[in-house]
Amino acid sequence: MILDMFRLDDKVAVITGGGRGLGAAIALAFAQAGADVLIASRTSSELDAVAEQIRAAGRRAHTVAADLAHPEVTAQLAGQAVGAFGKLDIVVNNVGGTMPNTLLSTSTKDLADAFAFNVGTAHALTVAAVPLMLEHSGGGSVINISSTMGRLAARGFAAYGTAKAALAHYTRLAALDLCPRVRVNAIAPGSILTSALEVVAANDELRAPMEQATPLRRLGDPVDIAAAAVYLASPAGSFLTGKTLEVDGGLTFPNLDLPIPDL
């Protein structure tokens, strides 16, 4: 049956930034598809709430509260997953982000910090996870969460957009290095209604122009990204590697225009 190809029965996944937003949605979707999940983020209470939902779906959950802005901390999650569940099949590098700023106010340290948070953490966990995937499962799948800002240009996103563009290309490079036993793909979300857009969601004057600028005339839901992640992690996506799925409502130009004046 075709739907069976989207199952993740008895797989083990690590998801960074799994306490809320996209990470929480992906964790719950993986559990509903049959996977056990290690979720990691900074806030224990958020992790506990997501873990409760995973267990309610009939799967095991393990939580790690840590500051994942540091690659050396993120790298430890792979071994913790094997310690908790006995193996590791899937990694979702979801943690990341950088606050918008004008180009002339963006320092070289800001660029380096954005790269470390968005690319360095993904690389550290991937390098730690792959040997364990090979040892315990014979292979696996890595999914990196990039962004449309890694493809489109908008004012205020020099550091963030550059880092997410690097993550998308890192995905292509890692896929070639790790084939054929480990697949590496990315998802580039558009404007998704998470806490990062809570101000937009509550204000029709802000939300309506963003929806109008999106060809599908709506903003995304975290489940849109979760569904793409299930596809990439499951046998249904077994012939994809090195690709970035653009789950953005059809954007060809940014739908968020920060009030940054002309020079």
Curated annotation (Swiss-Prot):
Any single GO molecular-function term of the entry would be: oxidoreductase activity
Kindly give the InterPro entries that the UniProt entry links to this protein. NAD(P)-bd_dom_sf, Sc_DH/Rdtase_CS, SDR_fam
User: Binding positions for substrate?
Assistant: 147
- Which residues catalyse the reaction? 160
* Keyword check for Hydrolase: no
The keyword Oxidoreductase is annotated on this UniProt entry: yes
- SUPFAM superfamilies per the record? NAD(P)-binding Rossmann-fold domains
* Gene Ontology BP annotations: symbiont-mediated perturbation of host innate immune response
Q: Where are the transmembrane segments?
A: none
The record's top EC class is: oxidoreductase
Q: Which keywords appear in this protein's UniProt record, sorted alphabetically?
A: Oxidoreductase
Family (UniProt):
Belongs to the short-chain dehydrogenases/reductases (SDR) family.
Q: Where does NAD(+) bind?
A: 17-41, 164
Give the top-rank taxon of the lineage listed in the UniProt record for this protein.
Answer: Bacteria
Name a single GO cellular component: plasma membrane
Q: What is this protein called?
A: Uncharacterized oxidoreductase Rv0927c
EC id:
1.-.-.-
